[in-house]
């Protein structure tokens, strides 16, 4: 109920009026930037055991954009969240709340989470959701070739951190990318390469910096084709089975 009232209030007031705070820390553009530095509400939330029941209520606000299923939007405006590691979710929400990751659309909603415990609760609920299988993929006429090109690039540079099936690494804060929307992946990698995602991992920036736009398209096409065994939602009744 609390989340529903907050959502109504935000939408009726106009979320554009709730601008993000000025950055409290320098991001990757600063010489003293340290990725995933300890401290603050992020570290507090990571030490807490999330309660999925309470997290379900907290997620009501998030569901307005990311959908109740956590599927986000295939056009990439809102990422697929379901099944994401709690560590990644907590870090990204804390970074947005602190002004380290610039996201004016997300900030008013992230700001409704009242304390580190609620961050942990929401993350626990989201992580437990199955990953939808009908996410946005690359659909160009050259899809097969692009996916093949992306697979080769991914296995050379991305697999070590993000895993064979896109499972990421919970302990190292590397995100699950299986089931993520192609357009979201492409946008994030482009922003990381070009220095516009201020909370980016410097190690990833070094890897991705030399890639051309065409190569990023190929990698994103392949990444969006990945599925994570045991974590994906079951196909809807009546849906055609994949061969």
Tell me what each language-model feature is.
Residues 1-45, 94, 98, 225-243:
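N-terminal export/targeting leaders of redox proteins
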Residues 14, 51, 106, 118-119, ...:
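Generic hydrophobic secondary-structure packing signal
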Residues 19-26, 73-80, 96-129, 134-140, ...:
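Axial heme c-ligation environment in periplasmic c-type cytochrome domains
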Residues 22-58, 74, 127-153, 173, ...:
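Electrostatic cytochrome c docking/interface patches
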Residues 27-28, 121, 181-184:
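Conserved long hydrophobic alpha-helices within structured protein cores
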Residues 52, 63, 67-101, 107-112, ...:
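Gly/Gly-Pro-rich "capping" loops immediately C-terminal to redox-active cysteine motifs
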Residues 55, 62-68, 122, 126, ...:
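The canonical Cys-X-X-Cys-His
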